[in-house]
Design a protein with these regions (language model features):
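ATP-dependent helicase/translocase motor core
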Residues: 1-297, 306-322, 341-345, 351, ...
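Short beta-strand/turn micro-motifs composed of small residues
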Residues: 172-173, 302, 391
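Conserved helicase motor
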Residues: 305, 326-335, 350-355
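Short amphipathic alpha-helix with an adjacent loop that forms part of the alpha/beta core around
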Residues: 336-339, 380-381
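Walker B catalytic acidic pair
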Residues: 349, 392-394
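Conserved ATPase-coupling elements of RecA-like P-loop NTPase cores
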Residues: 356-361, 394-395
């Protein structure tokens, strides 16, 4: 198959997945016109031409981390009459409800020439995924190199058009398909030794690779799945200003943890080997559970003080300030009883938890001697609450 035939086959496949093909969007003007329609519809607003131009000036930035944040949050914009418009770029509450469109051979001018992109997926008019294709026999790594070259070209589309919102790159020669997140230059390198990390091949739950473009599209590019990949399973590492995509087995583990809890189906056991990213899996499960109103607390329990610090630092690396330090058992008890959203995810050692809950513990006996309520009595109201407890290293 020629590259053109592979491209057409992918567009047809996306059509089967209920994407809308937009052959009319061929350049920057068409991209912006479509984005404006989608933006106004989503936010139930009509912008003047000058407001729309100002909006573009505000949201378009070469900083990938900034655009990734803008894409996931409620933002504000001052209108010509001085009133504030709170808006989102996509439906962040339910990504499945966004419009999913596909464009091909989009041409964007740079300082010295132009760049042409094989296939782009637009989510609510935002170019969120770029797919570069090669013919069979040509390594997809050539497509990776092309993306890196495009990003280094002065005045490229990723720095001064809506392409700054690309979250994900996919490269394929039809039989071999890889994907990786967009990032700022310091986290986005490709060298002669063909090292490019982190780059992924998608996999099924049994970890068998899904490499053929048709199968990949079916599994990964289904609208709701792609929405989840971007919104749930891409982590914005604030401390490093970096986008990090979870590996397939981590995604399945998180899904199973969340399902198990939501269906109230008892306990579970996640078996990940050393260095496989257990902390990220636990962090993601905790943050997704944080938004479940039926759950009072999510406790992540480790067995040593140094692990407590290490895990807390890792969690805070993924999301700044998401976990506070429990300096002592009293702090832990206070946070367990707190209704504050910030205290919903707690990292603690099994020793501190034991001191609080064990009626016969030294701490509880000392409090009793001093005529104060035992921690175990203070925590009694939690008996009827739904608590999620994740034990690390529970072998």
């Amino acid at each position: 198959l020629t590259e053109q035939e592979i491209e057409q086959s992918l567009i047809d496949k996306l059509g089967d997945l209920k994407y809308t093909y937009r052959p009319d969007i061929r350049d920057r003007a068409g991209l912006e016109r479509n984005f404006r329609e989608k933006f106004e519809e989503l936010n139930r607003v009509h912008l003047t031409d000058s407001e729309f131009q100002r909006l573009l000036d505000e949201i378009i930035t070469p900083d990938v981390f900034t655009t990734a944040t803008l894409l996931r949050e409620i933002n504000s914009f001052t209108r010509d009459d001085g009133t504030t418009l709170n808006y989102t770029l996509v439906n962040i509450k339910d990504w499945c409800k966004n419009t999913f469109e596909v464009v091909n051979q989009l041409r964007i001018n740079t300082d010295n020439s132009f760049q042409r992109y094989d296939v782009m997926i637009l989510i609510n008019g935002i170019p969120a995924v770029q797919i570069e294709l090669k013919t069979l026999g040509i390594s997809p790594r050539r497509a990776m190199q092309q993306i890196v070259d495009y990003k280094n070209d002065p005045g490229n589309g990723y720095t001064r058009t809506l392409l700054c919102f690309v979250q994900l790159f996919i490269v394929s020669n039809r039989t071999d398909t890889w994907y990786f997140t967009n990032n700022n230059a310091r986290h986005f390198a490709f060298n002669a030794e063909e090292r490019f990390l982190p780059i992924y091949q998608f996999a099924a739950e049994d970890n068998s690779k899904i490499t053929h473009l048709d199968d990949f599209a079916e599994q990964f590019l289904a609208k709701c799945t792609l929405g989840r990949m971007i919104s749930r399973y891409t982590v914005l590492v604030a401390s490093e200003q970096k986008l990090l995509m979870m590996r397939p087995y981590q995604i399945y583990a998180v899904q199973r943890i969340v399902e198990c809890i939501e269906q109230n189906s008892g306990n579970g056991y996640i078996w990940h080997t050393t260095g496989s990213g257990k902390t990220l899996t636990s962090f993601k499960a905790s943050t997704l559970l944080k938004d479940n109103h039926d759950i009072h607390k999510c406790l992540f329990v480790v067995d040593r003080k140094d692990l407590d610090r290490q895990t807390r630092e890792e969690f805070n690396r993924f999301q700044e300030g998401c976990v506070e330090e429990n300096t002592n058992t009293a702090t832990l008890v206070r946070r367990l009883l707190s209704e504050d959203y910030a205290d919903k995810v707690i990292v603690t050692t099994i020793q501190k938890l034991g001191l609080a809950l064990d009626e016969q513990s030294k701490r509880n006996k000392n409090r009793q001697k001093r005529g104060r309520d035992k921690y175990s009595d203070l925590l009694a109201p939690l008996r009827d609450k739904r608590m999620v407890i994740i034990f690390d290293e529970c072998h």
